[in-house]
Amino acid sequence: METQWTRMTANEAAEIIQHNDMVAFSGFTPAGSPKALPTAIARRANEQHEAKKPYQIRLLTGASISAAADDVLSDADAVSWRAPYQTSSGLRKKINQGAVSFVDLHLSEVAQMVNYGFFGDIDVAVIEASALAPDGRVWLTSGIGNAPTWLLRAKKVIIELNHYHDPRVAELADIVIPGAPPRRNSVSIFHAMDRVGTRYVQIDPKKIVAVVETNLPDAGNMLDKQNPMCQQIADNVVTFLLQEMAHGRIPPEFLPLQSGVGNINNAVMARLGENPVIPPFMMYSEVLQESVVHLLETGKISGASASSLTISADSLRKIYDNMDYFASRIVLRPQEISNNPEIIRRLGVIALNVGLEFDIYGHANSTHVAGVDLMNGIGGSGDFERNAYLSIFMAPSIAKEGKISTVVPMCSHVDHSEHSVKVIITEQGIADLRGLSPLQRARTIIDNCAHPMYRDYLHRYLENAPGGHIHHDLSHVFDLHRNLIATGSMLG
C-alpha cells in the first residue's frame, strides 16, 4: 500500500534534518515514538561536530520519548531546545546546566501553541506509523500524542514504518483535531469511550520525503508494584474513594479515573482492582500503564481512553494477540483531546497524580527539586488537576531515609495552586482540603500527611509565623531547604 514512498535507512533519512531545524517526534512516552531516527540524528551530530560544524536540532515531542533516545541525543550534544516534557537523566543534566533550553508546558496546550506559530515552523516531523496509503493517510501506533498536528504542520515528514506493531492497532485510534478559536466547536465526548474521529491522519502525500522501515518494540516501563510505601499510599487512596462513595459524593457507578505514570499510580490501580466494593469503572487518562491491562482483562476496568499504551512489550503483545477483545475497550486519542479541560470537567474525572513536595497550605511542586533543578516536567498533571471533579495528589511523606520532608512550610516551586488541589495523600494519611480555611488546611496536612519526625517542626513554624489570612515567616520559611543544601538533611 505504501510502495510509492522513497525507502531510506535511518542514517540516510537523518541527512534530511539540518542544523537548527525544528524537529517534531511522534509518540507519548516511549509508546509510538521514533526508534531509529534518534540514534541516526545523534550519529550525524557527532560527525558534524568532529568536522567542526554546528549541528543541533530543536525538538518537540508529545510528552517524553524513551529515555534512551533522549540520552543518545543529549550525549551527542544534538539538541539545543526541547519541549514539553522529558524523563532522561542525561538530558535533565544538560537542562539544569543551562546547555539545553527547556520549555515546560501543560500537555493539552502544545498542539494549539504550534498551530499558532509560537515556536515557529516545524521543519521535519518524524512519525512512527503502522501503515501508509498512497493518498496520504497515515495510521499511527501505540502512542498518538501530538502526531496528528505534527503531520499537518510539518514542511517535511519522515515515516518510521514499524512492522513490530500489529496493523490492527489502528482500530484503537480516534483522531480528531479541534478547530481554531473563535470557531472551535465543542468536542462531543460525553462518555469515556465515545469515538468522534477517524482511525488515521490525512495529509498531503507529497510531504512524505522518506520511509524508514523498522521492527522494534516500545521501551516499556519497569515498575515495582510491591513497594510497601506505594502500597500504603494506594490503600489510603482506596480508603478515601470508598468514603466518598459512602457519602454519595461519588455515584454508585463510579467516575472515570485519570492516573499518572509511576510506581505509586500503578499500585493504586492494582489496589482499586482488588477491592470488591469498587465497581467496574472507566478511565479517561493520558496514559494507560501496566496494571490497567490486567484490569481490562478481568473486567474491573470496562473501558479506557488515553493517548498512549505505556506498557511492557509483553503486555502490548497480549493486546495485539487479543484485539477482538481489546479493540472495543481501548481508545487512543491525540493529547489535546485526552487532556482536554472541557472533557475532563464534563466527565467528572477523578485525577490521581504524584507531587515532589507540598506546602502546608496545599500548593504542590511537581517539577523542580529545591526549586531550581528540573526533574521531568509538569506533563499532563496540570490539565487534569485544574479541571477534575476530584484532584488528588500523592507522595511519600519523606525521601532519602528521612533527610527530606515532602511537606514543607512553603513550596520551593509551585506548579499547582491551593485553589485546585483538593486532596493530599501520603503513606501517613489523607488530608481532605475541601472547604477548609488556610490555617485549617495547614493543620490538616501536618497532622495527616507529614511524617512524625517533621510534625513538631511544622506545627512550631505555623504557631510562630505572623500573618493574617495566611501565616508565614518569610525569614524562616525556607529553613528546611537551606538546611538540606548546607547539610544534606532538612533537619540539619
From Swiss-Prot:
Keyword Nucleus among record annotations: no
Segments forming a coiled coil: none
Source superkingdom: Bacteria
GO biological process, one term: acetate metabolic process
Keywords linked to the UniProt accession: Transferase
Enzyme class: transferase
Pfam families tied to this protein: AcetylCoA_hyd_C, AcetylCoA_hydro
InterPro entries recorded: AcetylCoA_hyd_C, AcetylCoA_hyd_C_sf, ActCoA_hydro, ActCoA_hydro_N, NagB/RpiA_transferase-like, Succinate_CoA_transferase
One term of GO molecular function: acetate CoA-transferase activity
Catalytic activity: propanoyl-CoA + succinate = propanoate + succinyl-CoA
The enzyme's E.C. designation: 2.8.3.27
Active site, renumbered: 286
Binding positions (CoA): 260-264, 376, 380
Function description: Catalyzes the transfer of coenzyme A from propionyl-CoA to succinate. Could be part of a pathway that converts succinate to propionate.
Family: Belongs to the acetyl-CoA hydrolase/transferase family.
Annotated protein name in UniProt: Propanoyl-CoA:succinate CoA transferase
UniProt organism field: Escherichia coli (strain K12)
Lineage, highest ranks first: Bacteria, Pseudomonadati, Pseudomonadota, Gammaproteobacteria, Enterobacterales
